[in-house]
Amino acid sequence: MYLIAMGNAMVLPIFTKSLCGFSDTTYGVATIFGSLLSVAAALSAGKIYDKLGIKPMFIAGTGLFATFSVMGLFLSLDTPILYIAVIFAFQSVAMSTLNSPTTAMALSGLEGKERVDGSAIYNTLRQISSSLASTLSVLIFTLMGSNLSAVHSVYIYYLVVTIAIAAASALYLKSMKRQG
């Protein structure tokens, strides 16, 4: 999930300012709603996870990531700032929906000191994937010409990564179900 979210945090503002001509302030105001939704989703994610488990959270979060990736394919130079705000909101809620439950699931099988070490490893992997996401997104954007088709290429990358993560996670959850 960090392979997508942090890359979008780099590309969407570049698109908004450089290609659409909106100011930094306009973009900042447009993202407030998504940020507030993200907080609400993060606060409720733990309770939902406790009641329903990882599967519904995973389906919802992955579905939101796929939706925001497809929405990115419809960006144009005339895209209204409201559409950009909605894309950001989908991405923010998707991130919040998946972040806490995946962390809990990743660390739930560990005991004592293993949990501390597991948390450190998990956080390190998140930081690495965040850096990789930013680098890959900007690399694709730059190599494709820093124009509208480059933005579409980045969102195709996001969609492919979302599908790959969904498939790998589904296989993992299926194998966990067989073991447990």
Task: Enumerate the language-model features and the residues they cover.
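12-transmembrane solute porter fold
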Residues: 1-177
